[in-house]
Amino acid sequence: MTTIRDVAKHAKVSVATVSRVLNKKGYVSKEAEEAVLQAIKELNYQPSSVARSLYHKTSGMIGLLIPDISNPFFPELARAVEDVASTYGYTVVLCNTDEEIEKERKYLQALKQKYVDGVILTTSFLPYKEYEQLNIPMVALDRYVNENIPLVASQNKAGARLATEHLLEQGCQFIAHIRGPKGVTPAEDRYEGFKEVVEEQEVANIVVSADFHIDEAQKVTRALLETHPTIDGIFASSDVVAAGAMKAAHMMGKRIPDDLQIVGFDGIPLGNMLVPSLTTVEQPIYDLGAVSTRLLIKQIEKKPLDTYRYEIPTKLVVRETTKGGENSENA
């Protein structure tokens, strides 16, 4: 393996001169620079990324922390982050925390030690002080951390209002909301949107909680429908939760949408593959990842930010789990 000393010897210059050429710092004569570049080419020398990281305290890497790689929402998000990051010359390091505080803490410390240039958080289980102490540029994606960390999110509350209003427009009289975990920003915002509408319209409603997992959503829905058989509409806090609700309804002999109408939230491809296809509130997942990455790189490059809160609109996509239509879209 060719070393920096081999390059120096081949170019007949000092190691320090080679280092100055590689790092573009300090004076080097034109002749010496050309000799070094020629030696690098002839020897096919590849500078050590580790050594360069130690020298510059930078790595050309961006960390992306996600809570659950098995949730179809996050691979699509990661694709956007990777696409944008690569156009700016950055490599993305994906860290799956499994919604565990200690895993998140260990990943962040490891990224710090490797001089990662910035981090995109889709998890936020640690106290703000721990994020602050890392002293790394950060962006929170769909998870509010603190006013000092820029947030990129969908208009979750407005989207939840769209979903709930649609169920009412289709004749639902007793609506259940299967909300996500408490303390998770998008779940809280969607719950708030739902509650606003049912209280404004004075509609019979019930709220239960479930993690963003199909199996738990199925169990919660079954218990819900057994206890309250007159429920005729469900607004699920994610498409994955909606899929679990659909499975429970099917196993109980409920006809969708005749007996029970269901609306999800996310707009992942899974929704269109289900039978019947899922009516959902679609959020621009790719745009969320792309905007977050550009915002992070702006911080890394020490450029001023226009705002610390970016909200991206959602839209209602009406399919077969509600009576509003088949594979039609409403803005």
Curated annotation (Swiss-Prot):
Keyword Transcription: yes
InterPro entries hit by this protein: HTH_LacI (IPR000843), LacI/GalR-like_sensor (IPR046335), Lambda_DNA-bd_dom_sf (IPR010982), Peripla_BP_I (IPR028082)
SUPFAM superfamilies: lambda repressor-like DNA-binding domains, Periplasmic binding protein-like I
Keywords: DNA-binding, Repressor, Transcription, Transcription regulation
Gene Ontology molecular function: any one: DNA-binding transcription factor activity
DNA-binding interval(s): 4-23
Domain HTH lacI-type positions: 1-56
A Pfam entry, by short name: LacI
PROSITE patterns: HTH_LACI_1 (PS00356), HTH_LACI_2 (PS50932)
Function comment: Transcriptional repressor for the ribose rbsDACBK operon.
Protein name: Ribose operon repressor
